[in-house]
A protein has these predicted regions:
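ATP-grasp fold ATP-binding core
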Residues: 98-99, 125-146, 169-182
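Short acidic/polar capping segments at secondary-structure boundaries
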Residues: 84-85, 112-116, 139-143, 153-155, ...
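Conserved N-proximal alpha/beta basic substrate-recognition cap immediately N-terminal to
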Residues: 3, 10-116
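Short, surface-exposed amphipathic charged segments that create phosphate/polyanion-binding patches used
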Residues: 49, 94-97, 121-127, 187-193
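Structured catalytic cores of enzymes that bind and process phosphorylated ligands/cofactors
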Residues: 108-110, 121-124, 131-134, 151-154
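Structural motif
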Residues: 5, 52-54, 135, 173
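Glycine-enriched alpha-helix->loop->beta-strand junction motifs that scaffold or abut catalytic
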Residues: 102-103, 130, 195-196
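Phosphate-binding site of ATP-dependent enzymes
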Residues: 145, 151-196
């Protein structure tokens, strides 16, 4: 039987509501699935035929450690997604790659740690004069951690937020806020075996 590890984090134990139904589905499919935390040093990852990233949600605060763990696991067994994809997807700079390949993405300005925050924000607001609201968030982030929505009138609060991110040596991004998120939410697409 195929053994798979469904990866979470010690700090995320019990927070992934989809794990129980996924475990049931794996059992029905004839798989032996176990939930394991990526940051549990007692796990023998080589015992699994595949290690599937599910909810290692603290990776954003421990990125170097997480990527080193991914590299170690991928040297022992199959990591899903593959290591190059994980590395690429952990940093929202991938949006620029997608855009360069013709994929429509939310207009994004990346701001790097050596940049003055207020002029960068003012240039962004000038480029997006029709945006009533905008978002400041870290390039490496999950959920809404350290992300904030601002009205144009909150330029200085947004610049301070941006400065805090940059001062902690984190790249950030600025995007117009899309009201469709309020109305329709966000949709994640999953691509398997050539289809969505």
């Amino acid at each position: 039987m195929t053994r798979i590890a469904l990866v979470t984090a010690i700090a995320a134990a019990g927070l992934d509501d989809d794990l129980d139904p996924l475990l049931d589905a794996c059992t029905r499919a004839g798989l032996i699935a176990q939930v394991r935390a990526w940051d549990d040093p007692t796990v023998a990852w080589g015992r699994f035929d595949a290690v599937v990233l599910r909810s290692p949600w603290d990776y954003t605060q421990r990125l170097d450690e997480f990527l080193a763990w991914c590299a170690a696991v991928s040297a022992r067994t199959r990591l899903v997604n593959p290591l190059p994809v994980v590395r690429w997807n952990t940093d929202k700079h991938y949006l620029a790659d997608l855009q360069a390949r013709g994929v429509a993405v939310v207009p994004t300005r990346f701001v790097e740690p050596d940049t003055e925050p207020l002029p960068a924000l003012q240039a962004f607001l000038s480029e997006h004069a029709d945006a009533a609201e905008f978002v400041v968030k870290p390039a490496v982030g999950a959920g809404s951690r350290d992300a904030q929505r601002y009205a144009r009138s909150q330029e200085f609060a947004a610049a301070n937020h941006l400065a805090r991110l940059l001062d902690s040596d984190r790249s950030a991004l600025l995007q117009p806020y899309l009201s469709s998120v309020d109305e329709h939410g966000e949709t994640a697409l999953m691509y398997f075996a050539g289809g969505y």
